[in-house]
A protein has these predicted regions:
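ATP-dependent NMP and nucleoside kinases share a basic, alpha-helical "lid"
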Residues: 93-102, 107-144
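Small-molecule kinase domains that catalyze NTP-dependent phosphoryl transfer to phosphate-bearing small molecules
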Residues: 95, 104, 122-123, 144, ...
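Short, acidic/turn-prone active-site loops that include or flank metal/cofactor-
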Residues: 34-37, 133-136, 155-158, 180
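ATP-dependent small-molecule kinase phosphotransfer cores
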Residues: 34-107
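An amphipathic alpha-helix signature
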Residues: 47-51, 135-143, 150, 154
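Walker A (P-loop) phosphate-binding motif
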Residues: 1-27, 32-34
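Well-ordered beta-strand positions
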Residues: 28, 127, 171-172
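Residue-level signal for inorganic ion chemistry
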Residues: 14, 33, 84, 109, ...
Length: 202
């Protein structure tokens, strides 16, 4: 079993950019959001159950889950949110475990946006890496890339663990408030560290 680093951070913190950089350096990356997309794309294994639970109105013309419609639905209805999580989370967990077991290399970056809020995921990682950015910067990044209003983005931010909670749980922190070069420099230093930790754990 590989040495597993749980990578997390708030929305707009730069998790994807950091994970891509680790992957570029040769790390194996297992991303729960990417797995969720695969499960809910056209022909994905979760689609029949989603259609049965929520009706065909949340399935787009392509046959994939309409993420915007589903997001609106679960924000408005806590019971719908629980039902969707009860369906998807076990599938995501099982697929994550399979991919981690097969992953090559000295260590795995396991990207879990809600790692701090999920005791099950936390118990399965050897180390917690938090990608950190000030809340104002998170909101601005998400607003620019998604077109959502500031109020909508802040609603998502407020539903996640606080910055203080994430930092308290962190073994390592990447400060992502500057340039991509600054991010790469921090990733490269941690990559060297994780290679050593991974080899020592084998």
């Amino acid at each position: 079993m590989s040495f597993v680093v749980g990578l997390t951070g708030g929305i707009g913190s730069g998790k994807s950019a950091a994970a891509a950089e680790f992957e570029r350096l040769g790390a194996s990356v297992v991303d729960t959001d990417a797995i969720a997309h695969e499960l809910t794309q056209a022909g994905g294994p979760a689609i029949p159950a989603i259609q049965e639970l929520f009706g065909s109105e949340v399935i787009g013309a392509s046959g994939a889950m309409d993420r915007k419609k589903m997001r609106d639905r679960v924000f408005a209805d806590p019971a719908a949110k629980k039902a969707l999580e009860a369906l998807l989370h076990p599938l995501i967990r099982d697929e994550s475990r399979r991919r981690i077991e097969r992953a090559p290399g000295a260590y795995v970056i396991h990207v879990v946006p809600l790692l701090i809020e999920s005791p099950d995921y936390r118990s399965r990682v050897d180390r917690v890496l938090v990608i950190d950015a000030p809340e104002e910067l998170q909101v601005e990044r998400v607003r620019l890339r998604s077109g959502h209003s500031e109020a909508e983005v802040r609603t998502v931010v407020s539903a996640q663990a606080t910055r203080a909670q994430r930092l308290a749980a962190a073994d390592d922190v990447i400060e992502n408030r500057g340039t991509i070069d600054a991010l790469r420099e921090q990733v490269a230093a941690l990559h060297r560290k994780y290679l050593e930790l991974g080899r020592a754990a084998q």
